[in-house]
């Protein structure tokens, strides 16, 4: 098994060497309009879409395999009275192939105001570009087309050395005597460019997430007890080192991350663990169109409520099963190409080996993204 895995990695490196700067899947799925693309006085019809076909073949006791075929659509009317103010109103639609009804059909409203060249605020539906800079261990990328779009309040800062953002996403709102809890997520992420020259750059990323379920004005569901407050936290810090190689392979990256988990409300915690940690070591190579990476994941009692299920110490498919120690080796290949300025296509394949059990899981997907503006009127 190990020999075949190494041979597959070498084959992917050979393929990718012949192939714009490669992006991560999180960057590829960015739909929200960048500030530098906003033009004052334009009233546009904007159409955002992401067609996806993702197949996850998972073995083991933690998560069952499944397939996600479908498309995400966001038709919008946008207006920018000035370069600093950008408004969107429209709809967020998700349809899975083989279903007659839309999986999600939600109204969309977003407003962004840029206080300065570096600092801006977003209200309503949030800017989820690059998934806030979160790694998949903390935030499952496919939530982009399975969950409701985030909505709340967000502040973003972009500088020459520091990029940071903080946000609160309100996922379930409650009124007096509602028989369910309010849900929201608070996040703070950033990366600091500690060193950079023509040959080497070093960034120091930090991520903090809090997930809360509670409320003071809700009541117990009919025939049941009032649920306790649940607050869970995840933390992450590390380094990302990129070496510019040139030639066919553009950069080689060496990354390391530490992750933490804490059940803040330990007295009412319903999960099997109240504290845990993990670390991730990753090396990758980037070519003009592709990225290949190999990583090692080691975790102890690690839980991330929004993270990719495969990495956790608790089972999603069997609520009674948990395993404190996890060790996973993974190899991933991601290819993407810009068709036009507003359209991109991508493909990825991933393999995961659970070291204790020897289970081999894999995932692959194909994606087509289109973000297009149609000018209706210039004021």
Indicate residue ranges for each PLM-predicted region.
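Transmembrane beta-strand segments of Gram-negative outer membrane beta-barrel proteins
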Residues: 33-56, 87, 121
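Exposed, low-structure sequence patches enriched in small/polar residues
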Residues: 70, 108, 159-167, 179, ...
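Surface-exposed extracellular loop regions of Gram-negative outer-membrane beta-barrel proteins
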Residues: 68-91, 156-167, 254-255
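Surface-exposed loop and membrane-interface regions of Gram-negative outer-membrane beta-barrel proteins
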Residues: 81, 85-116, 136-137, 307, ...
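Surface-exposed strand-loop-strand hairpins of Gram-negative outer-membrane beta-barrel proteins
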Residues: 50-72, 89-97
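Bacterial Sec-dependent N-terminal signal peptides
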Residues: 1-28, 155, 362-379
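Outer-membrane beta-barrel biogenesis signature
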Residues: 22-44, 127, 377-379
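Surface-exposed coil loops of outer-membrane beta-barrel proteins
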Residues: 120-191
